[in-house]
């Protein structure tokens, strides 16, 4: 079934356009892809052929590698390349190893065949992608003669697919789970072969429960004893029916609403599905706020997706120590009134301004000015200031304080080089206890996801700066940052070994500033949250970019970057950025 726009389709398209193809898939139906950049970029479901009579070792191994790209009939064609005693014992579902096939083809002799290639990543049995770094695949296929035909006696653990095949014939599906407070939905991204990426597969992933380590901060709305009892069906107008066990009829209205929101958003990625209805033991299940036919759509549960409604963010900049707004058209800098704006001096100027998804109204006779948060010029004080006021308050102190962020609950977060490194100020202005283990590394930049559960981190150890994703939780009155997973990008298409800044573009996409080598120019890249896809967003100028801020959106990109020489550029489309201001020392965005 066709999926709605997949951002990896865009990433894959750009990578192919920039680097060319290392191999060509055989044939198959095409799927709709994402956006203007990917109008011609569509996922291909490979239709492989079994081995021909008398096929050489090279043809058998090449055919097997291609056949592993198709999961149809439990990899029936791929099994036909194996010896008869191995074909039924091979478990292709154990894992998926993705390798770089560029200039790395199988090597054979008159009786052997082996493949040596860099490993890009692996997909586990639940469909989660795990990027790798500095790993090499070394596999001997154990060629054997069977009834006069060459066959493979030593298949890999799971399947092997090239990076190009992964980008072209696998699909990305977000599976949604609830926060512990049941007020937001957070996507867990999985990857499946396109032929197997259907609503039933998505529901199986959802009903399997919250995977580790997300189970520490998320939960499912599916109560114990309630199960999906069969396969889904989609009618001619796009209504999918989800069959639940009879016990679902015992759920309270609030439980039904939470369950419907989780299922509906999980199925929202399929283009053929417009609305969802549920049955309990074969009878129609009534839902709060449902239409007369008891169908619901994702729009009904939009409040569970924590993305701002605005289509155009407000850009805030600092020029010559003064805070101000940048007009939507650009080139017009409106200095704010008050101590950190028009009245700013060298003693009260700021080094950083906090971004937020909250709306920050302009001061007017009927409205007081917005409350802003910033870091002092010496990076030792976290400040709060109401626009138009002459008073500046210090919320916390530290050393080398990072650009702060205001979260949806009005709390403020930043990092310091001192202990405790994580600083969180509650909405009431009090400093909260924090618990974090960085494993001896330092945070050099961070960005909290719109769901306020995931945190993207630029982590430094020695001269190395890399990307990591951690989880935020609140336990016994303290804020915990835990389960930090490294996201290596050195094996990706863009080969990024040095990351300097990061911002969330959506719930599943990041923009990072990075470069491949120390002497390179730092430019923006769009990255899938699990590291499964990456593409350049264009080299903007000959000067490296110093900062990136963004307002997360469900689709599209609202990002602003600041160069090392003070040029502010706003993302327009594809690889286009528009210069909007010069002489800028700091930047932030708000809804």
From Swiss-Prot:
Keyword Signal among UniProt keywords? yes
The way it spans or sits in the membrane comes to: Lipid-anchor
Q: List the InterPro entries hit by this protein, alphabetically.
A: GerMN, Lipoprotein_LpqB
Q: Where is the signal peptide?
A: 1-20
Identify the keywords attached in UniProt to this record, alphabetized: Cell membrane, Lipoprotein, Membrane, Palmitate, Signal
GO terms under cellular component: plasma membrane
According to its UniProt record, where is this protein located? Cell membrane
Keyword check for Nuclease, yes or no. Answer: no
Give the lipid-moiety residues, type S-diacylglycerol cysteine.
Answer: 21
SMART domains to which the protein is assigned, alphabetical = Germane (SM00909)
Instruction: Cite the positions of N-palmitoyl cysteine lipidation.
Output: 21
Task: Tell me the protein family, please.
Answer: Belongs to the LpqB lipoprotein family.
**HAMAP family cross-referenced by the UniProt entry:** LpqB_lipoprot
Q: What is this protein called?
A: Lipoprotein LpqB
> From which organism does this entry originate?
Cutibacterium acnes (strain DSM 16379 / KPA171202) (Propionibacterium acnes)
